[in-house]
Amino acid sequence: MTKTLTKKISNKKHAAVVTYIMGGDGGLDNLEEQLLFLEKSGVSAIEIGIPFSDPVADGPIIQLAGLRALKKQVSLEAILNKLATSQVQIPLIIMSYINPIFHLGIPKFVEMVQKTPVKGLIIPDLPYEHQTLITPELEGTDIALIPLVSLTSPKERLKEIAKQAEGFIYAVTVNGTTGVRNKFDTHIDTHLAYLKSISPVPVLAGFGVSSIEHVEKFAHVCDGVIIGSKVVQMLHENKKAELGTFLQKAAEVRIEN
């Protein structure tokens, strides 16, 4: 069964644009407003980060957003309860470290997620080899477990991950944490083109994407981008009009590969 997320991300003409926000940054009461704003801006899907005290993959902007949310006592359960009443029509994706999911309980987590518009799950600190901790609970659901793929992964490992991939492949474009960047690894284009050649699902580039030029660059070699730190920072600074314009332009970028 092709997951809803894969169908929504697949677009042969325009780059898929997935945005990231930290759940509860600015207060849980603002979450629905943020989601509806991003949906109106033309994005394909929205990742919602779950605040965690030891966010190993997060750069400084997202770490600060997580701290702001934690100070407001925001939890995974509180976010899922809020999402259960969301009116958003595009797919949502939960990005959480494994600890908050364990704390809530995997069966309860999956049960709660199915009552929301969430169609994807990213767990950055859950290695591919340990996915069976959660995949039995996800079987038969419309929730895609999205793999994170690093630049340094050997080809055999990439093939194995691609074979099992759901939703889309999250191709990490840098060696390091999230954050706004000006430069990417010189081998990134070759890496993405190879991933696209072996993947049955769309391939999206993430970590460091922060300009229309970046979106255009990646539209030549993969199916779209994930934009995180820039979105988090602009929402925090209340630059919604500027952010909305940027995202609308990004969503109009044509795929050239």
From Swiss-Prot:
GO MF annotations in UniProt: tryptophan synthase activity
InterPro entries, alphabetized: Aldolase_TIM (IPR013785), RibuloseP-bd_barrel (IPR011060), Trp_synthase_alpha_AS (IPR018204), Trp_synthase_suA (IPR002028)
Cellular component terms per the entry's GO annotation: cytosol
CDD domains for the chain: Tryptophan_synthase_alpha (cd04724)
Keyword Amino-acid biosynthesis belongs to the record: yes
EC number(s) from the headed UniProt entry: 4.2.1.20
Reactions that this protein is recorded to catalyse: (1S,2R)-1-C-(indol-3-yl)glycerol 3-phosphate + L-serine = D-glyceraldehyde 3-phosphate + L-tryptophan + H2O
Residues forming the catalytic site: 47 (proton acceptor), 58 (proton acceptor)
Entry-linked Gene3D superfamilies: Aldolase class I
NADP is among the record's keywords: no
Pathway involvement of the protein, from the record: Amino-acid biosynthesis; L-tryptophan biosynthesis; L-tryptophan from chorismate: step 5/5
Keywords noted in UniProt: Amino-acid biosynthesis, Aromatic amino acid biosynthesis, Lyase, Tryptophan biosynthesis
SUPFAM superfamilies from the UniProt entry: Ribulose-phoshate binding barrel
Biological role stated in the UniProt entry: The alpha subunit is responsible for the aldol cleavage of indoleglycerol phosphate to indole and glyceraldehyde 3-phosphate.
Binding partners and assembly: Tetramer of two alpha and two beta chains.
Family of the protein in this entry: Belongs to the TrpA family.
Protein known as: Tryptophan synthase alpha chain
Organism whose genome encodes this protein: Listeria welshimeri serovar 6b (strain ATCC 35897 / DSM 20650 / CCUG 15529 / CIP 8149 / NCTC 11857 / SLCC 5334 / V8)
Lineage of source species: Bacteria, Bacillati, Bacillota, Bacilli, Bacillales
Gene behind the chain: trpA
